C-alpha cells in the first residue's frame, strides 16, 4: 500500500521540488513526468496517477507559457497528493473567464506549437479534488491542487 511504501523509504510524507525554467522549452513538462514516475513507483492507483499527472502538467505548462517559469512543490502522503505551482508572471486578469473552456491569452507563437487551447485550468479543475488559485495582477499566480488518495481504490 502507499502508506507503507512512503514510510518504508521516507518515514514521512515525500516532498519533491522543481524549478520550472521559463527559457527552456525542452524541459517543459519534466516536473509532471517526474511526479508521474514517482507516484507509479509508490504504487498509487493508475487513475489517480493520471489525474495528478494531468493537473501537474497543465499547471506546469501554464507557468512556463504565461508566467515565464516558476517553481513546483509536490507533497505525497498516505492521504493526499498536494501539488503547488507558482510563477511570478503578470497574474490572471480575469480568473472566472480563464476557467471557461476555450478561453486563452496564449500568443500566436505558442498556439502554433500546439498549446494555448484554453483547456489548462478547466482540465486542472476536472482532475483535482481541491483547486485553489491565488493570482494578482503583476504579482504572479499560485495554483494549489489536491488529489485525495483513497486506499480502498488502490487495489
Regions found by a protein language model. Name each.
Residues 2-54:
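Bergerat-fold GHKL ATPase/HATPase_c domain
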Residues 53-57, 61:
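Short acidic amphipathic alpha-helix that forms the conserved interface helix of the HATPase_c
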Residues 5-15, 60-155:
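Conserved beta-strand-loop-beta-strand hairpin that lines the nucleotide-binding pocket
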Amino acid at each position: 500500500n502507499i502508506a507503507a511504501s512512503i514510510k518504508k523509504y521516507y518515514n514521512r510524507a515525500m516532498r519533491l521540488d522543481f524549478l520550472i525554467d521559463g527559457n527552456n522549452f525542452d524541459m517543459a513538462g519534466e516536473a509532471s513526468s517526474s511526479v508521474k514516475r514517482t507516484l507509479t513507483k509508490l504504487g498509487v492507483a493508475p487513475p489517480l496517477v493520471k489525474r495528478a499527472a494531468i493537473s501537474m502538467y497543465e499547471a506546469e505548462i501554464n507557468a512556463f507559457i504565461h508566467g515565464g517559469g516558476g517553481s513546483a512543490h509536490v507533497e505525497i502522503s498516505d492521504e493526499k497528493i498536494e501539488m503547488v505551482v507558482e510563477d511570478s508572471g503578470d497574474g490572471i486578469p480575469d480568473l472566472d473567464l480563464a476557467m471557461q473552456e476555450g478561453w486563452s491569452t496564449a500568443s500566436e507563437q505558442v498556439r502554433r506549437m500546439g498549446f494555448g487551447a484554453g483547456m489548462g485550468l478547466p482540465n486542472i479543475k476536472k482532475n483535482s479534488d481541491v483547486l485553489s488559485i491565488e493570482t494578482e495582477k503583476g504579482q504572479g499566480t499560485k495554483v494549489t491542487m489536491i488529489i485525495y488518495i483513497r486506499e480502498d481504490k488502490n487495489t
